[in-house]
Amino acid sequence: MDKSTWTTKVGLAQMLKGGVIMDVVTPEQARIAEEAGAVAVMALERVPADIRAQGGVARMSDPELILAIKEAVTIPVMAKARIGHFVEAQVLEALGIDYIDESEVLTPADEEHHINKHKFRIPFVCGCRNLGEGLRRVAEGAAMLRTKGEAGTGNVVEAVRHARAVYSEIRRLQTMDEDELFTYAKNIQAPYELVRQVAESGRLPVVNFAAGGIATPADAALLMQLGVDGVFVGSGIFKSGDPARRARAIVAATTHYNEPEIIAEVSRGLGEAMVGIEIGKIPRDQLMAGRGW
């Protein structure tokens, strides 16, 4: 079968723009997410909060679980592969998954190489903390980006930091002349043509979602107002007191992110949010966002 072009894969990712993608660990959770208005679900055995709490090596989910979730919903299904583990990605593609997340939430399989995403028919999403990381992933074939944030914490501070870093660097690029763009591209180890494209268009060449620590409707709206194209919500929904209601509220806040009255209304009576973690109290070797390069 012919491989889809990168442009086609970017177009598929564009279809998710403005939406919410939710982590789910059972077919029932996937149905709740779809009914709440999620544009896609991420099939996982453990949400990031449980991966963080339980430790050990986190790998690709069991294909049986992924297929059960795929059969339960009509919206696209994503699944995670370890950084650099191209065979996990091959397995996910064989299962008929719609998108693959080469994810720092799982334990990296290769500490020197990311997956060559151009070799696959289906789109990849990758995390980034800044513009350089994002453009390096795009050069490898990523069709969609997301902030890394700090998954499983219920603390949005790192996602905000990463989103602000990306968009402030884009604004800075627009003030540079050609010589400065060459130097900048060399310094961030990204292709000059991609850097020039971003400087001219004032935006990333692919959609960029927020992820990591989003727990409330206001969190989702905050990232949307900062300029992201949509949000991933992991532990924040199904680790809360009323997952179905919180899921609907986060979808509404993502859609109406510039309307505080609506965000206020949907935020009422949601029950207890997930218990958060202060980033500064996480041991350095347990931080996930630093995985990848």
UniProtKB/Swiss-Prot annotation:
One of its GO terms (biological process) is pyridoxine biosynthetic process. The active site is at K80 (schiff-base intermediate with d-ribose 5-phosphate). D-ribose 5-phosphate binds at D23, G152, G213, G234, S235. Signal peptide: none annotated. Its EC number is 4.3.3.6. Coiled coil: none annotated. Gene3D superfamilies: Aldolase class I. It catalyses: aldehydo-D-ribose 5-phosphate + D-glyceraldehyde 3-phosphate + L-glutamine = pyridoxal 5'-phosphate + L-glutamate + phosphate + 3 H2O + H(+). The keyword Lyase applies. Pfam families: SOR_SNZ. InterPro entries: Aldolase_TIM, PdxS/SNZ, PdxS/SNZ_N, RibuloseP-bd_barrel. GO terms for molecular function: pyridoxal 5'-phosphate synthase (glutamine hydrolysing) activity. Pathway: Cofactor biosynthesis; pyridoxal 5'-phosphate biosynthesis. Keywords: Lyase, Pyridoxal phosphate, Schiff base. D-glyceraldehyde 3-phosphate binds at R164. In the presence of PdxT, forms a dodecamer of heterodimers. Belongs to the PdxS/SNZ family. Catalyzes the formation of pyridoxal 5'-phosphate from ribose 5-phosphate (RBP), glyceraldehyde 3-phosphate (G3P) and ammonia. The ammonia is provided by the PdxT subunit. Can also use ribulose 5-phosphate and dihydroxyacetone phosphate as substrates, resulting from enzyme-catalyzed isomerization of RBP and G3P, respectively. This is Pyridoxal 5'-phosphate synthase subunit PdxS.
